[in-house]
Amino acid sequence: MLLTRKADFSASHVCRNPSLSEEENRALYGANANPHGHGHNYVLEVTIEGDPDPVTGMVFDLRELKEIINAEVVDPMDHRFLNHEVPPFDHTVPTTENIAVEIWKRLDHRIALPNVHLKNVRLYETADLYVDYGGER
């Protein structure tokens, strides 16, 4: 059974690779390479997979899942300039893809139980742009 919990956070970032020239960054990332950055109101969907516990009837305690998402993602990333305030984005380009991978890394170890595991991280950068990440294959 799949269970999905939503959360949102606002953050700013700039997409630029320090090993590339200004011209290369602008060609690659366009306006997203503006050194002053820009922001998004991200929507995060965290999906876990498991069987309902025979005693509780729940796959996972929803309050605990919310607390984990807040502690690992929302609290450290909300209203932050990712490049300057949230490792590893001081040395990794904070694309939506890379942010989704980092969120996975932060959550995977916190959700791993004998019969429950993290299935997918979906991160919306805008209403019509999102990334799905299901861990390394």
Regions found by a protein language model. Name each.
Residues M1-R137:
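Charge-rich, low-complexity N-terminal segments
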